[in-house]
Amino acid sequence: MELRSWLLWVVAAAGAVVLLAADAQGQKIFTNTWAVHIPGGPAVADRVAQKHGFHNLGQIFGDYYHFWHRAVTKRSLSPHRPRHSRLQREPQVKWLEQQVAKRRAKRDVYQEPTDPKFPQQWYLSGVTQRDLNVKEAWAQGFTGHGIVVSILDDGIEKNHPDLAGNYDPGASFDVNDQDPDPQPRYTQMNDNRHGTRCAGEVAAVANNGVCGVGVAYNARIGGVRMLDGEVTDAVEARSLGLNPNHIHIYSASWGPEDDGKTVDGPARLAEEAFFRGVSQGRGGLGSIFVWASGNGGREHDSCNCDGYTNSIYTLSISSATQFGNVPWYSEACSSTLATTYSSGNQNEKQIVTTDLRQKCTESHTGTSASAPLAAGIIALTLEANKNLTWRDMQHLVVQTSKPAHLNADDWATNGVGRKVSHSYGYGLLDAGAMVALAQNWTTVAPQRKCIVEILVEPKDIGKRLEVRKAVTACLGEPNHITRLEHVQARLTLSYNRRGDLAIHLISPMGTRSTLLAARPHDYSADGFNDWAFMTTHSWDEDPAGEWVLEIENTSEANNYGTLTKFTLVLYGTAPEGLSTPPESSGCKTLTSSQACVVCEEGYSLHQKSCVQHCPPGFIPQVLDTHYSTENDVEIIRASVCTPCHASCATCQGPAPTDCLSCPSHASLDPVEQTCSRQSQSSRESRPQQQPPALRPEVEMEPRLQAGLASHLPEVLAGLSCLIIVLIFGIVFLFLHRCSGFSFRGVKVYTMDRGLISYKGLPPEAWQEECPSDSEEDEGRGERTAFIKDQSAL
């Protein structure tokens, strides 16, 4: 028996050697597949294939089909004449050919970059597998060619020798000074180096003898100068909406203050820019917004209190150190999707990239450095498949990210078997895996949104509140969901010390997401007003079943507050057939995969098919649509079913002022045609009135406390001002008394009689200096005024 196995092995090896030799000599190698021309449609082709033992692999195009036979050798030096002849005699077969294996080589020759600092880019080419597997994506031939990335920041040095070759003016603008030039403003401290550093991570030119290389070193790179001046809602919106059909990826490494007490996010215009980007950008495929998760770790901040990283429209990226640990600056939250490398402790390496004044740096740090690395990997992935939507990209990240080599105490396995962490999301991005999966990716079904009103009456939070609700995920409705993507818990609550709250959401499949951890520096009594806490931890789970919201007071203090509204918002998909699709016909142009890209007149494109009437929540619009041919991407003007604005249920246009009807939680303004949320007072259930004699005293105390709490900030502010004025007056009188000052003006106060010592500073002689007008103007030029505080991460 052993001899027989050995002989079989020898024969197989010899056959392989013969095939390799034949291949090298240019001889034909026949496969076990045939191309067959059979008019009459797929059913006729299936019958012919089945009759002769073939399997129909599908339509090549028109009446040409791809047949495969299990019994035929996969690779042979001679054709299989018997099978070929029997199939040829079939009257329905007009032509056939046994397929021959052809040698094809990618014309991108991969060579390791020769840039001087490339060996120091450990996160691209690690020898211990602690890297982002970027070299594997390069080896597959993907370097970012044809992809455009814009850095939304303080400008980029467009003439930097490692950026100039890839600079794209169409992806650049100076919103601060209203001109097309994003060149940063130079200062002594090089304050505006942030954008240039981020740009180099994405697309620093390769093999030019300067610095290192970008992740997508053949991508086009631009920058928007928008942080070096007044940052307003309009400034953010203009930046986020710049050239959305030219720019593929926007990378942002900034956000509200990471001080552990701020709750802030995009205002109306920026939120609209996000929505327009994902619904209309890239010809309807959706702009991709990559966001740094935040640097507030030392302040115990939560990135779920940052409305930019907490948005479903952004791909939020966290950081890991060289040794796979959570950095000291990292924020943990349930909205983070994945991680790339960045800086850590003093003994760990940092990020190599371009720097101001045409220099290089080896010390780029923070989540600022993580987001551009992710943007570069996403650029490689888009080159592999330019038809990916913004949601496709998030699915690819979830499916390919790697938890290995990352250390954290909170790794958990969700309901579909994936490991997920509040510090790392689904793990490290893997560039090689992403481009490999992207090449044959099937576009995900259109996004569905199911809104479930959970709370029907206000509930006292006390020490701990638990709200349970069984949901069907909109079963029986067109927006029924069976596979989750993002989940939002929209909460309105009051609490006398917001930072003591911890909030958790448990899915029907048992995944526990921390929506909010305690924030010791948050003393606010403002609570949350319809704040959308988002989690990605239940991705691909079935949302049907019991959801549990837990709110707890993490301190020993006798805090108090009320949960007045809880809306669960589910985003996801369902298999085709679970809801009735709109009528479909009228396709004018099909791709090779039988997806419709252009419809006949009177039809609109929806879910890869053509419909006469767009479904509720969509409107027909003529847009530029992109689709890939064999060698290029074509742009075609076509009528497409475009989603209504997020605030509308149905609409007559994409703007928030085009609403025809509203979701259940909002009301329609018939004049403005906008949907506005009901005021908090109208949402609160009024308690039933009791006769005064029957009201126990314990009911009066919470109301009194709540009343005091509502005015507490104003009272404290007034007392503080009064105390400051009194102290200032006492010190003023004391100093003038000591210096012999007379209110009649007989003596003049001078400082040469003594010293003034400030706490925390060494005593030194104080001299009052009045700056000249020129000095004052120069100083004003060096200062930056922010209407809306932003911090570079």
Curated annotation (Swiss-Prot):
> What is its membrane topology?
Single-pass type I membrane protein
Q: What happens when the gene is disrupted?
A: Conditional knockout in pancreas causes mild glucose intolerance. Insulin secretion by islets of Langerhans cells is reduced. In islets of Langerhans cells, processing of pro-proteins including Pcsk2, Ins2/proinsulin II and Gcg/proglucagon and acidification of dense-core secretory granules are reduced. Islets of Langerhans are normal.
Q: Where are the FU repeats?
A: 577-620, 638-681
Q: List the disulfide bonds.
A: C211-C360, C303-C333, C450-C474
* Residues that bind Ca(2+) 2: D174, D179, D181
UniProt cross-references to InterPro entries, sorted A to Z: Furin_repeat, Galactose-bd-like_sf, Growth_fac_rcpt_cys_sf, Kexin/furin, P_dom, Peptidase_S8/S53_dom, Peptidase_S8/S53_dom_sf, Peptidase_S8_Asp-AS
Listed binding positions for Ca(2+) 3 are: D258, D301, E331
Catalytic activity, as annotated: Release of mature proteins from their proproteins by cleavage of -Arg-Xaa-Yaa-Arg-|-Zaa- bonds, where Xaa can be any amino acid and Yaa is Arg or Lys. Releases albumin, complement component C3 and von Willebrand factor from their respective precursors
- Point out the annotated site residues (description: Cleavage, first): R107, D108
- Listed EC numbers: 3.4.21.75
Annotated residues for binding of Ca(2+) 1:
D115, D162, V205, N208, V210, G212
Supply the enzyme class, top level: hydrolase
Tissue expression, as annotated, is: Seems to be expressed ubiquitously. Expressed in islets of Langerhans.
Q: Which residues form the signal peptide?
A: 1-24
Phosphoserine: modified positions: S772, S774
Compartment(s) of residence: Golgi apparatus, trans-Golgi network membrane; Cell membrane; Secreted; Endosome membrane
What PTM annotation applies here? Answer: The inhibition peptide, which plays the role of an intramolecular chaperone, is autocatalytically removed in the endoplasmic reticulum (ER) and remains non-covalently bound to furin as a potent autoinhibitor. Following transport to the trans Golgi, a second cleavage within the inhibition propeptide results in propeptide dissociation and furin activation.
Domain characteristics, as noted in the entry:
Contains a cytoplasmic domain responsible for its TGN localization and recycling from the cell surface.
Protein name (Swiss-Prot/TrEMBL): Furin
The gene that this protein is the product of is: Furin
